[in-house]
Amino acid sequence: MQAKNLCFYLSDHGFGHIARNIPLIAEAVRRTNGFVYVVCGKRHLEFAKANLLELLTPEQSSHIRYRAEHTDIGLILQQGTLLVDTAALTDACAQYLAERPERAKQEADWLRQHDVAAALCDMPLWSISACEQAGVTLLYVGNFTWTELYREFLPEHIWKAYAAEYQKIQHGMLYALHNPEMLEFLPRAELSETSLVARPFHPDEIRAIRAQHTCPVVFVALGMSAQFTQPVSVEGVEAHFYVTEGVPLTGSNVTVIPYSTLHTQDYVAAADYVITKAGW
C-alpha cells in the first residue's frame, strides 16, 4: 500500500458533489497509507464525515483531514423560482474570478507544504491553477463544467474566463450521462469514461420506509439553489411525499428530510416516483 497524500476539491454548491465523492474518498483511504484531505463547505464536510465513519474503520478514518472552505458559486436563482438570477450570478462569478489568482497561489503553497501527490477536482475552478502551479497531478471527475452552463446566462468575458481554466485540465474522468458540450472545454485532457457512483443502499431501512405507507411514495428534491416562499398544499393527493429542505410542499402527507439525514439515498430507493431538477 502506497503512502501518498491526496486531496479532494469538491463543490459546495448543493450536496450532490460531496455525496457522489464519498465512495471515492472511502476507496482512496483504503488504498493509501497517507493522508486524504477533503476541501468543501462546513455543512458538507459534517455530512461526509458522518457517512465515512460508517464506511471506514476508526483507524482508516484517522487518515482523513477535513478543511472547510467556500469552494464554488454554482447557480443563483431568483427567489421562489427555478430561474437563474443573472445579475446576482454575474456579480458573484466576477468576484470569484477576481480572487482566483491569489487563492490559487496560496493553495499551491499549501499543496507543497502538505506534500500532496495528486488531487481530484469536482468543479472548484481555483484548484486547477493551484495544482498546475504546485506541479500536482489533477484528475477532473464530473459530468459537466460550469462553462457550458454559464455561457447561456453570463457575459462572454466571464464564461470564457472559466473556459480558460478548464482548458488547463490534462486528466479527466467523465460519468455516464455527462453533458457532451463539456468536451469542448477539455481539449487537452486525456479522458476516460466511467459509469455512475452512489453511496450504498440499506435494504432494511428501505423496507421500513415503504412499510409505513400503503399509498405511493414520492421523493421530491429541488436542490439548495431554490428558495421558495409560497407553500404548495398536497393534502388531498393520494401519496406520501418525502421532501428535502426548501421544497415548499405542505400537508399531513409530507415528511421533510433534514440535510443532516445520512442516508437520503434510501428514500430515493423506497420511492415509487422521484421529482427532481437536473442534478445528481
Q: What does each of the following model-derived ranges do?
A:
Residues 10-22:
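A short, glycine/small-residue-rich beta-strand->loop->alpha-helix junction that serves as a flexible
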Residues 149-227:
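A nucleotide-sugar donor-handling region in carbohydrate enzymes
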Residues 118-123, 266-280:
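A donor-sugar binding/catalytic signature common to diverse glycosyltransferases
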Residues 103-163:
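Conserved nucleotide-sugar donor-interacting segment of glycosyltransferase catalytic cores
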Residues 34-98:
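Conserved nucleotide-sugar phosphate-binding/catalytic loop shared by glycosyltransferases and other
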Residues 25, 199-273:
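Donor-nucleotide binding loops and adjacent catalytic segments primarily
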Residues 53-70, 136, 188-198, 236-264:
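Active-site regions of enzymes building and remodeling cell-envelope glycoconjugates
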Residues 41-46, 123-126, 176-181, 224-225, ...:
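Short, polar loop motifs at secondary-structure junctions
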